[in-house]
């Protein structure tokens, strides 16, 4: 249904800062452009927080808001919608 995650890193600044919490809604979710989402990296299997910038059929292009400090679709390409765990809502600490 939902979970809480702690933000680590700077890739989503200023929207989400290191130490912030995100509430991740997992039910009845279909990603839309500009959504902030949590997904499993296709490279390392780590959980990442990124923003949906493009949608193409069953895949999303995901990028960090802080382009200078983000490992995202610019490195690993399109991410299948099935890898997205849910929509994230930032709760600042």
Where are the regions that the model predicts?
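Extended hydrophobic leader/signal-anchor segments used for secretion and membrane insertion
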Residues: 1-93
């Amino acid at each position: 249904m939902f979970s809480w995650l702690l933000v680590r890193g700077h890739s989503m600044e200023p929207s989400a800062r290191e130490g912030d919490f995100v509430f991740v809604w997992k039910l009845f979710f279909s990603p839309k452009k500009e959504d902030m989402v949590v997904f499993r990296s296709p490279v390392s299997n780590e959980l990442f927080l990124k923003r949906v910038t493009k949608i193409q059929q069953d895949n999303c292009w995901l990028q960090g808001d802080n382009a200078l400090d983000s490992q995202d679709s610019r490195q690993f390409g399109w991410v299948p919608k099935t890898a997205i765990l849910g929509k994230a809502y930032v709760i600042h600490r």
